[in-house]
Amino acid sequence: MQTQERPPSTEQIREFVIAGHGNIEKVRQMLAEDPRLLNASYQWNENDTETAIQAAAQVGSANVAQFLLKQDAPLEICTAAMLGMRDEVEHRLDEDPRNANATGAHGIPLLPHTVWSENPGLIQLVFERGAKSGATLALHNAVSRGNHEIVKWLLDNAGPDVRSKNFQGKTPLTVALERSNDRIVALLKQHGAIE
């Protein structure tokens, strides 16, 4: 009589997806123990699922995303944008202009994913091709990376809400102050930011 291996449990999938947000060692270990986790999707709520590579893409964890891609995880446009894969992103936008409205995990739009690439030309490309939603989250991402050039571009072009709070309840100005990034602090204040 053959015994069938049990599929990964919901808790294992959840743990793997959480690790995908940046814990490369845990991702490697868990995937070595059970390769079926690679494309397993955790359901956070009725309309919100996430895989480990989507987790990596939404937080800008390039090393985790690259590792998972080498294991044959699917490459979505949001992941390609986060990794700065301009040719791939441009190809997908040419193939179907509606890809500018693509979202990753938790419905996060393409623009905030692209900001993680820290590639101003790619950010401008996706924006000009229609990826205009998510400007406020994109600003939070750029501030958290301390990228003055991208913060300035977003403020000048994308119309983000400089007074919005991130998932930790912090405004972009608060984050810039905590990181002692005086150039970004001055820039945000010029655009009406408050703590």
Q: Model regions: which residues?
A:
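A generic tandem-repeat structural signature
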Residues: Q66-R86
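Ankyrin repeat domain, specifically the short helix-to-loop turn at the C-terminus of the second helix
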Residues: L31-L37, Q66-A73, L93-N99, Q124-K132, ...
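Ankyrin-repeat and related helical/solenoid repeat scaffolds used for protein-protein interactions
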Residues: T136-R179
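Conserved ankyrin/ankyrin-like repeat signature
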Residues: K26, N63-V64, E88, G121-L122, ...
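Ankyrin-repeat boundary/"N-cap" motif
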Residues: R6-I18, N39-A55, P74-A81, A102-H113, ...
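Leucine-rich solenoid repeat scaffolds
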Residues: I53-G60, A65, L69, K165-E195
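Ankyrin-repeat intra-repeat helix-capping/turn positions
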Residues: G22-N23, G60, G84, E118, ...
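Alpha-helical protein-protein interaction modules
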Residues: E25-K26, R36, E95-R98, G104-I108, ...
